[in-house]
Amino acid sequence: MTILMKENLKKNNPRKPIRSPLFYVGDKYKLMPQLLEVFPNNINNYYDVFGGGGSASINVEAKHFHLNDIDKKVIELHHFLQEKSANIENFIFEMQLLINYYGLSHSEFGKNPVIEELKKVHKKTYFSKYNKSGYLELRSDYNSNQKRTDLLYLFITSIWF
């Protein structure tokens, strides 16, 4: 076992941490500035044994990464996002098509008049009111075909109500 002594470590260049596209309970995003202070430079193999959303792996510089999680679907999502990152514009386009197909809200295109009306009546739950039927259809479609990682990603990043 190698013990790292603080005096042998160089501080990594401080930068704003990168957020993971997977929000996950136990996310290390907010801790990354403090964690990076004690990480060595020139990491060859980085082992993220409790990978979750992957915030630690995204923010560490290393030659090789090894991500582990007890939930195989979490690892599947990481592989999916890694594959899609090769053509991010196409990935965004595909997600927008799915959002439109399921009739989910999409604030990138400005205010939605239906949502604005719901906001007047349902002050705290207007998004869930708007998205409920699309969300339920998306969930049903994913449960019918769990090989659709694109549906899983959209499902977990949808509004929870």
Tell me the role of every PLM-derived stretch:
Residues 1-50, 55-56, 60:
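S-adenosyl-L-methionine
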